[in-house]
């Protein structure tokens, strides 16, 4: 009972973090500021915002200024006549069947869609960085487990050497202990490489140019949120998923395109005004103001009917794409939820297995020190402990990946910024 109580206390104790360590939120904030893909996405969003103006929609008049010089030669008298001309003309479309209003509304919708797509890129980025952050934690924990295995193998090799020197252990025992120590050392070296790869990947995601910059994580364990519920996730997904919001923007854009097409069924009204001036070499000058109103109606252009039908089909297709994505999201959520719940159950089971493996290893070590357990049996107990540690680590990380994906699909991924 004392041993079990000690094991449970050891599992429950928090691990102290280093001074100056950075949290996940710190890493995300750095990445959001530096990542090149996100900078491009923000620039594209800014372009959409810049385009959403009254001028681009056609609300404002067009003004043109002209100037010229002309000359003539009388072939009979040889006299040269020349002069200069200049003028300013303006034209303003007052009404064109609501096409201007539809165009402006479309530009505003494109602006909102640009913001949604930037959010989509940000959420993808946060999910990727969060997964890599916890992957590095996973690699660090695995490194710690392998280092412990190396220490145990080294201690066993020391004991066998002492026993071999006094004749109480065979050369076979010594060779096997050496092989096991070398194998554990090789795994530890390989794990250093995997840990460095994960660290470099984090540097890349955060656009950190100096790969030697110290990288100290505030977290040393993979904490899993077991409080998620399916109904709340489904409701949030249908309401907040960025990809689904983008499809709804597409429906609105298709509706505005249809409205612009329908504008051809209405007359148009245009106002124009101008001032023109002409001056000749003889000193004569004249100028004047002209203005007018033009009303017109497009009786037939040969394409109006098909364009209306195509615009209606585009609305239908946009709505079908939305429904298709909704169905896909429901399916993805169901798969992720099943994996999430299964991994939670697996995690609970592996916690029990780890306690058993730790107790078994403790007993085996005591018996080995007393000489009542062979080196092979001691190695089996050590390997069982390492396997149990690896299984619970994989269960923790896989559960965390499911949690990250569930938060992303439901539009709640930015919670990791808190």
Predicted regions, residues:
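Bacterial N-terminal signal peptides
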Residues: 7-15
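A short glycine-centered flexible hinge/capping loop motif at secondary-structure junctions
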Residues: 164-168, 368-372, 409
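Small/polar, glycine/serine/threonine/aspartate-rich low-complexity segments that form flexible
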Residues: 66-96, 102-103, 216-227, 259, ...
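Acidic, low-complexity, intrinsically disordered peripheral segments
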Residues: 26, 391-418
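Bacterial Sec-pathway N-terminal export signals of envelope proteins
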Residues: 19-64, 209-252, 326, 337, ...
């Amino acid at each position: 009972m004392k041993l079990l109580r000690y094991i449970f206390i050891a599992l429950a104790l928090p691990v102290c973090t280093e001074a100056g360590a950075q949290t996940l939120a710190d890493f995300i904030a750095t990445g959001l500021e530096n990542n090149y893909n996100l900078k491009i996405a923000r620039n594209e969003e800014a372009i959409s915002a810049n385009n959403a103006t009254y001028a681009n929609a056609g609300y404002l008049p067009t003004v043109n200024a002209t100037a010229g010089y002309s000359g003539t030669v009388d072939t009979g008298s040889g006299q040269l006549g020349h002069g200069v001309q200049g003028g300013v003309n303006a034209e303003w479309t007052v009404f064109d069947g609501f096409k201007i209003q539809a165009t402006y509304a479309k530009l505003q919708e494109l602006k909102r869609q640009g913001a949604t797509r930037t959010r989509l890129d940000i959420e993808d980025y946060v999910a990727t960085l969060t997964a890599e952050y916890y992957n590095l934690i996973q690699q660090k924990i695995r490194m710690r487990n392998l280092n412990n295995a190396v220490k145990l193998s080294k201690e066993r090799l020391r004991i066998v050497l002492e026993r071999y020197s006094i004749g109480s252990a065979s050369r076979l025992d010594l060779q096997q202990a050496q092989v096991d120590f070398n194998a554990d050392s090789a795994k530890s070296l390989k794990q250093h490489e995997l840990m460095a790869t994960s660290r470099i990947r984090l540097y890349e995601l955060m656009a950190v140019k100096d790969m030697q910059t110290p990288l100290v994580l505030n977290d040393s364990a993979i904490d899993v949120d077991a409080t998620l519920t399916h109904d709340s996730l489904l409701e949030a997904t249908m309401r907040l998923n960025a990809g689904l919001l983008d499809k709804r923007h597409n429906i609105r854009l298709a509706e505005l395109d249809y409205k612009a097409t329908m504008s051809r069924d209405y007359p148009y009204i245009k106002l124009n005004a101008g001032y023109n001036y002409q001056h000749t070499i003889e000193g004569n000058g004249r100028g004047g103001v002209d203005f007018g109103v033009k009303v017109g109606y497009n009786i037939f252009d040969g394409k109006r009917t098909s364009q209306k039908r195509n615009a209606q089909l585009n609305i239908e297709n946009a709505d079908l794409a939305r429904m298709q994505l909704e169905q896909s999201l429901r399916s993805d959520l169901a798969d992720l939820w099943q994996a999430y719940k299964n991994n939670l159950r697996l995690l609970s089971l592996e916690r029990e297995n780890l306690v058993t493996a730790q107790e078994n290893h403790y007993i085996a070590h005591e018996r080995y020190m007393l000489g009542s357990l062979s080196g092979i049996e001691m190695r089996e107990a050590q390997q069982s402990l390492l396997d149990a540690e690896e299984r619970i680590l994989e269960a923790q990380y896989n559960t965390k990946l499911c949690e990250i994906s569930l938060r992303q699909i439901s539009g709640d991924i930015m919670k990791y910024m808190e």
